[in-house]
């Protein structure tokens, strides 16, 4: 994930949960401590995060309709899930992810 992609993700997650996310909110999502967390996010919005944080952000991105549901989480395309139920189940999953984002930022 690049810095501009992280900044776009912050905007997209904010849109998904219905409120703008600050850099402090993103720091909470990443588990970064105050007061250095927001500063770290600002740096990452230039250089990009790495390692486990980048993977965590890829997972949290699924809260937004603008990002795909990662294959390891996509249990909706299995043969035992009726095709006409898949969109509703995917939407319910995204709502669950949005709830997780809201819970993490408090």
Regions from the PLM with identified roles:
Residues 11, 31, 42-47:
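Residue-level detection of the helix-turn-helix DNA-binding "recognition helix"
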Residues 7, 27, 38-42, 57-58:
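Key DNA-contacting residues within the recognition helix of helix-turn-helix
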Residues 1-4, 21, 36, 49, ...:
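Short coil/turn linker and secondary-structure boundary residues
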Residues 62-106:
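Short, charged recognition helix plus adjacent turn
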Residues 33, 46-71:
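DNA major-groove recognition helix of helix-turn-helix/homeodomain DNA-binding modules
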Residues 1-19:
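A short, Lys/Arg-rich alpha-helix, primarily the initiator
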